[in-house]
């Protein structure tokens, strides 16, 4: 198992991600396999020299089912770019499970956290977000007896609050599929996005549901990247109680539509965002 772990670390290094820890221990054999990494770090070889640091990372796999790995992390998680801290993630508890398929590749991931808080830098400003409970579930979509390149996702957040959206905490739930999302497992950054775009990758949003006080929003749709690397596609938004949101975004003319449930298509086409028939903004290229 030790040699397999070293091979995985070497494989990651070949992809430009370098894993290390100050003190690594292995125990539990022959009943289970336990790995503990104190002061874990992963550094990217990209131009920004991005680096993530974690106080402790532990993983356990039972000997009768080594394909299922249970992971526990002790924070904080600190992220750096160009030697500057850009994000700080803390939590009361954070647990994860990772399932490996017969080819020893990951095919299913679940992440569950309680009392999670995030501080991050955006355009020179510090922002804060928090959630009392969050879940992330990913899996390669099964097709018959095999696995496709599509990644299905489900995300939940309870008690979500942020400085950018003052007021009651929100409940968020979303499900969907990233077609050809497997490329993001083996590639990174612009290379992953461009490979995904050329493969005609698409994000299929089955449902995004946001509830916050008297406000309720449901979003469905499909998005991709066009030849100019700009977002293209359409999402349909329906909701109620959104008067304050429209006014804060300079769209007070739409607040009168709140007598009944609002239903509006957001169309991303030819480099522009359209709200129904109205051109709202010019879209930038993502890379």
Can you annotate each of these PLM segments?
Residues 22, 191-198, 208-210, 224-229, ...:
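Extended terminal
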Residues 41-49, 77-89, 116-129, 159-169, ...:
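Flexible, membrane-facing loop/turn or short amphipathic-helix motifs
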Residues 23-27, 54-64, 90-104, 127-146, ...:
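Extended lipid/amphipathic-ligand handling interfaces
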Residues 1-13:
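Alpha-helical transmembrane signal-anchor/signal-peptide segments
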Residues 69, 107-110, 148-154, 200-207:
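Short, hydrophobic/aromatic-rich segments at coil-to-beta transitions
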Residues 154, 218, 232-236:
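Residue-level detector of the transmembrane beta-barrel scaffold of outer-membrane proteins
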Residues 14-146:
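N-terminal beta-strand/beta-hairpin edge segment
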